[in-house]
Amino acid sequence: MPRISKIRVAALNLVIENGYDGFTMEELAHKVGVSRRTLFNYIKDKESAVLGSEMSEEVENQFQNFAAGLPTGSLREDSKIMAMTVFNRAVGDEFFPEISQLTAQALATDTKLRALYCQRNSRIIQRVRQAVQAR
């Protein structure tokens, strides 16, 4: 399993066991078997450890291309391409089924994580809205 996936699985398990505020990044690093410093080479913060990175460079580039009428010039085709890029980024990890199941379990057990998840989704929806309006 790639280290970034190990980090997510460990972070999600810690949320399920202790709640979002119930563990430290030091504990997460220990569970993954890396130093705290090494942990931060892979993730930005606790939220990204638990929920994954919010917006990759690839996805942001796709939003910019979409807003500019690229790559095909067809709204329908470009919408499909943008949606598939976002979807593939979210589920492209071969460990997606396990991570998805753990995420659902963590969201069901922790209200703070649910709030962070909703805020993140609102930001992504806003970014999609901006790209559509720019087009």
Task: Enumerate the language-model features and the residues they cover.
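Amphipathic alpha-helical packing segments from all-alpha helical-bundle domains
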Residues: 106-135
